Structure formats: structure tokens, C-alpha cells
Amino acid sequence: MTKIVRSKYKASRRLGVSLWGDSKDAFNTRNYRPGQHGQNTMIKTSDYGLHLKAKQRLKCYYGRVTEKQFRNIFALAQRMKGNTGENFIGLLESRLDTVVYRMNIAPTIFAARQLVSHGHIKLNGKKADIASIRLKEGDIIEIKESIQQIPLIQESISKQGQTTPGYLSFDIPSLTGKYLRVPALSDVPYPFEAEVHLVIELYSR
């Protein structure tokens, strides 16, 4: 896990934003790229480079979703009715690992995915161990009793009410959450400017 933490902070510096809004993020004090020439600000980014960076930021933010998964999500969003960008974010935000993270059951998206893959999360009363499962309105999330008292989980849950977005609910006494609705892009609490339109333009070429 320590390697993941170091790696994610390095990603923030490489991509030029504090990806998860973490106070420990090295980007807050060294807001330039890692490496020997990181402080060289004279490098001009091409139009393609700007689009690519917007995509890399979102992929990294959602726990380094693979390129194949990301493209498949875009393809599905494109086939759906409505705005492709809104659909795209709605699909990403309905993933089980994302919802576990948003509910503050886990402190990071990486920890959330680990909880899911290790079978510590229940979906509608049944074990769910696939991070990419897409939730529907009204779906219920529970934490298995065997991990409810783990300090890391308790500390994360204590932040309930501070950052849990309005499209989710979480009941602390029962440690049960509910997926209320598909969020709009404006509902999602990104700690950086998520330039979704650039990602859509890149994949639409």
C-alpha cells in the first residue's frame, strides 16, 4: 500500500494537479513534474497533449482504470441517450469501487477497490467482489461485519457527512449505504477541474 501511496502522489505531480485533494500530496509543495527537468516550465503542450492529459487525470483519479475499460465505458456512454460526457461520468460514478470510496468506507479509491476485490463489501445482501459492477438506483451497500472495527475503516467512516455527495446516503449506526441516483457532472466533488469534454473529444476523433 505504501508503494501505491508514493506512486499516486508522483502521478499528481506528473499530471499537474492534486488528483485526490490530499493534504499529504507532494504536489502541494512541489507543483512541478518529477524528474531532473521537472521545473522546466517552458515546455509547451500541444492540443493533443492537453486532451491526453485530461484523459490520464480521469483514468488515474478513478484508480488507474485500464485503457480498455475506459474506452468501453466511453462506447457505452456514446450509445446511451443524452449527453455523452454526462453519461460517461455517470457510468464511472456508478462503479462499485467508486461508490465505496464516495461513501467514505475507504480512504482512497485504491483501498476501496481492495475492499471489494477481497470480498469485504455486500451489494443488496450478497458478496460483491468485482470493482466494475455498475450500481442501479436503490442498490444497498454494506460492510462485512468482519472488518467493521478495523481502525482504517472506522477513521474513514468518521468523515461521513463532510464529503458524502448528495446522490448517495450512508447510515453510520448500521454501516449501510444506498445509491440514490445517477449524478450529474456538476454533482461530482472533483478536487481538480475534470475536463470531461476534452476526453470526449479525444475518443471521438
From Swiss-Prot:
Residues 94-157 form the S4 RNA-binding domain. Belongs to the universal ribosomal protein uS4 family. Keywords: Ribonucleoprotein, Ribosomal protein, RNA-binding, rRNA-binding. One of the primary rRNA binding proteins, it binds directly to 16S rRNA where it nucleates assembly of the body of the 30S subunit. With S5 and S12 plays an important role in translational accuracy. SUPFAM superfamilies: Alpha-L RNA-binding motif. This is Small ribosomal subunit protein uS4. Part of the 30S ribosomal subunit. Contacts protein S5. The interaction surface between S4 and S5 is involved in control of translational fidelity. HAMAP family: Ribosomal_uS4_B. InterPro entries: Ribosomal_uS4, Ribosomal_uS4_bac-type, Ribosomal_uS4_CS, Ribosomal_uS4_N, S4_RNA-bd, S4_RNA-bd_sf. One of its GO terms (biological process) is ribosomal small subunit biogenesis. SMART domains: Ribosomal_S4 (SM01390), S4 (SM00363). One of its GO terms (molecular function) is rRNA binding. Transmembrane segments: none annotated. It comes from Rickettsia prowazekii (strain Madrid E). Gene3D superfamilies: Ribosomal Protein S4 Delta 41, Chain A, domain 1 (1.10.1050.10), RNA-binding S4 domain (3.10.290.10). GO terms for cellular component: small ribosomal subunit. NCBIfam families: PRK05327.1, rpsD_bact.
